[in-house]
A protein has these predicted regions:
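Charge-rich, low-complexity N-terminal segments
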Residues: 2-3, 7, 26, 57, ...
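C-terminal structural segments of small proteins and small subunits
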Residues: 51-79
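Histidine-centered active-site/metal-ligand motif
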Residues: 28, 47, 63
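Short edge beta-strands and adjacent turn/loop segments
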Residues: 14-30
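Solvent-exposed beta-strand sheet faces enriched in polar/charged residues
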Residues: 23, 32-34, 68-70
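N-proximal, solvent-exposed amphipathic alpha-helical segments enriched in charged/polar residues
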Residues: 1-18
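Charged, amphipathic alpha-helical segments and their flanking helix caps
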Residues: 43-44, 48-53
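A short interface-forming secondary-structure element
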Residues: 33-45
Length: 79
């Protein structure tokens, strides 16, 4: 079974993040990801970066992953 912790681990191993949190119920998950890697990228490009960290899990194991992606500067303005 997929857990929020396993998704968080996949993302953390695949990209440098300043903040990362994942919650979910085993089928539907929500992630908040803050990374400098998102600078200059649009929302689709940011999501593609995260999907790359998940590999085949997005097609085979995870039904839905909702993401909020921010640069560190954007994240600071959200607080």
């Amino acid at each position: 079974m997929v857990t929020p912790e396993s998704i968080q681990l996949n993302i953390a191993q695949g990209m440098v993040t300043e903040h990362l949190s994942v919650v979910g119920d085993g089928a539907h998950f929500e992630a908040v990801i803050v990374s400098e890697a998102f600078a200059g990228k649009n929302r689709v490009q940011r999501h593609q970066l995260v999907y790359q960290t998940m590999g085949d899990r997005m097609r085979e194991e995870i039904h839905a992953l909702s993401m909020k992606t921010y640069t560190p500067q954007e994240w600071q303005s959200q607080k």
